[in-house]
From Swiss-Prot:
One of its GO terms (biological process) is carbohydrate derivative biosynthetic process. C.sativus and L.esculentum expressing S.grosvenorii genes SgSQE1, SgCS, SgEPH2, SgP450, SgUGT269-1 and SgUGT289-3 accumulate siamenoside I and mogrosides III and V, thus providing a strategy for vegetable flavor improvement or for heterologous biosynthesis of mogrosides. Keywords: Transferase. Its EC number is 2.4.1.-. This is Mogroside IIIx synthase. UDP-alpha-D-glucose binds at S293, Q356, W374, N375, S376, E379, D395, Q396. The active site is at H43 (proton acceptor), D142 (charge relay). Coiled coil: none annotated. It comes from Siraitia grosvenorii (Monk's fruit). Pathway: Secondary metabolite biosynthesis; terpenoid biosynthesis.
Amino acid sequence: MTIFFSVEILVLGIAEFAAIAMDAAQQGDTTTILMLPWLGYGHLSAFLELAKSLSRRNFHIYFCSTSVNLDAIKPKLPSSFSDSIQFVELHLPSSPEFPPHLHTTNGLPPTLMPALHQAFSMAAQHFESILQTLAPHLLIYDSLQPWAPRVASSLKIPAINFNTTGVFVISQGLHPIHYPHSKFPFSEFVLHNHWKAMYSTADGASTERTRKRGEAFLYCLHASCSVILINSFRELEGKYMDYLSVLLNKKVVPVGPLVYEPNQDGEDEGYSSIKNWLDKKEPSSTVFVSFGSEYFPSKEEMEEIAHGLEASEVNFIWVVRFPQGDNTSGIEDALPKGFLERAGERGMVVKGWAPQAKILKHWSTGGFVSHCGWNSVMESMMFGVPIIGVPMHVDQPFNAGLVEEAGVGVEAKRDPDGKIQRDEVAKLIKEVVVEKTREDVRKKAREMSEILRSKGEEKFDEMVAEISLLLKI
């Protein structure tokens, strides 16, 4: 699909510029940081948690994203941050086929993802105007916008890359670029055969898109000022952090896990009914099922997962999502006939959205059937919930392997054709949530949670020291 954008929308209004400029002038001697995440929810969430931590250290934060994304994350920002974190709207070019409410990956139909990347890159001119107006002391940017550090460099503004993915997948991807004739030094990690085949047989168009995004990702890493921030922690990826530091000749500073800490009694749309249902279950007896905001399982995948849940005989909450604009799909049509009736009180199916962190933190949740998106992996580890990994694409197979290596979860193996197997899903759910065979996984997940919760705000000390050194403050 080809979408034509008008560049006129990139022009920032005089009134808006004046308001931002006045705010910048009022900051005086305060060190200001502009943060620019990619448009995916996992990226936004991690950046927002980092913004909170920086503001607690007396930095003033400008948080820049599209209006639809800013509206989505504002409820997660307590009023105590209203003076230290300011939202700044980034205008993407739009068109009748690509209006502003689609300027996010959340629920975006996969066919429109290339258009979103194109529109984001075309926002560079507007972003330059924002940088010129605010004149922040530092830019912290994500990994899919090489134009951001270029613009910052032209304005003599130092920039640091904050990577919201895991370190293993980055170091594994960079290794053949630096050492094309040698094996990755950590040979104990092996992808399942299905994923090896999938990554080696991508079609030409996918390969070209992947190549371009890989180049952008690589540029963002190398453009960072002597330091790379990573949403991870040494207990999980220490050896990969050390190796990435060697590959990039930059200091890799962990700041993770960056996880939204929910208040179980807080107001979230639809949570009261979920909480009431969870409260009736036994401790650690329920499995939470979700595949993130950007992947929509096929009907065949939905059926295999449903049959697996049914055969496991374990309580479950399953979040089912459909792309924006899909008004033809209903839960009943997507699931096997009679599934909801047979599940009865043992299962709850939620359409669209559910407060994942609150569900994972609830005492009756004992397992997480997850696509292994990095944000979900971090949340699961923070709350001590073991993972049953059902990765779908991009970095998720690598994350699932890392989860297995850490001992806090297991990956569901696919059949020789790469399809999800209902029997495998059922078996792993029972083992992880109920049976003694995976008690070691449950124990390791609890231990990991205790380690992470003991860190507190001290995990940001190294980051603050590096920023202070860079800015000479």
